[in-house]
């Protein structure tokens, strides 16, 4: 069953590259084939594969594939490369701002059972600095049609980054691991560096899509 999970994730991540290279039709076909094969596996191995395993598989599909795909989808929008880079910058500023604000002013724990070092004051500092960074970026690269929309983009990025970081901490606590892997030596796994982007990407993609009509 574990090998099936790993194969499922691997093929779906290949679908992400198909999305970037071949746009939408081939991606849809790959997803359809993979999911039909997984359903066939559950049918012919029942009751070996139960509902809990299928729900786990669905979560993997969402968290490891559907959410990251929005980074590529964001890149494919008009001025997508600049938008994606701007989002990355804002997320990094949010993370750094929350860290240093928490170190300087942190008093009240935000989620003590998940991440004892994160504070409400740190989160507020991260949000404010992200909004400021969105306004600064707007001077060089138009992100929105008004200052209000620019501030909303900064707020969305900060909200998604903070929740994404906490959710990855929740996953690590649930699975009893310190880091999500050793892909990046000294920095933990892939998710330890990019957890904040996973929820920000879909928020920004749909927001920018609505603004572009």
Residue ranges and their predicted role:
Residues 206-213:
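Juxtamembrane boundary at the C-terminal end of a transmembrane helix
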Residues 1-155:
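Membrane-embedded alpha-helical bundles of polytopic integral membrane proteins
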Residues 57-65, 141, 166-171, 201-205:
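A short, terminal or domain-edge coil/loop segment
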């Amino acid at each position: 069953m574990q090998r099936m999970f790993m194969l499922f994730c691997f093929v779906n991540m290949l679908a992400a590259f198909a999305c970037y290279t071949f746009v939408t039709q081939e991606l849809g076909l790959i997803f359809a084939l993979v999911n039909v094969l997984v359903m066939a596996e559950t049918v012919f191995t029942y009751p070996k594969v139960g509902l809990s395993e299928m729900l786990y598989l669905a979560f993997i599909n969402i968290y490891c594939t559907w959410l990251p795909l929005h980074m590529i989808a964001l890149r494919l929008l008009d001025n997508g490369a600049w938008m994606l880079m701007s989002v990355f910058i804002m997320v990094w500023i949010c993370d750094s701002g929350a860290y240093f604000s928490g170190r300087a002013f942190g008093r009240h724990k935000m989620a003590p059972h998940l991440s004892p070092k994160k504070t409400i004051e740190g989160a507020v500092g991260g949000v404010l600095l992200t909004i400021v960074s969105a306004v600064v970026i707007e001077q060089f690269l138009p992100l929105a049609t008004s200052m209000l929309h620019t501030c909303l983009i900064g707020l969305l990025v900060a909200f998604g980054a903070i929740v994404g970081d906490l959710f990855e901490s929740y996953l690590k606590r649930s699975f009893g691991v310190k880091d999500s892997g050793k892909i990046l030596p000294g920095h933990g796994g892939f998710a330890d560096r990019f957890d904040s982007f996973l929820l920000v990407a879909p928020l920004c993609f749909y927001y920018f899509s609505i603004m572009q009509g």
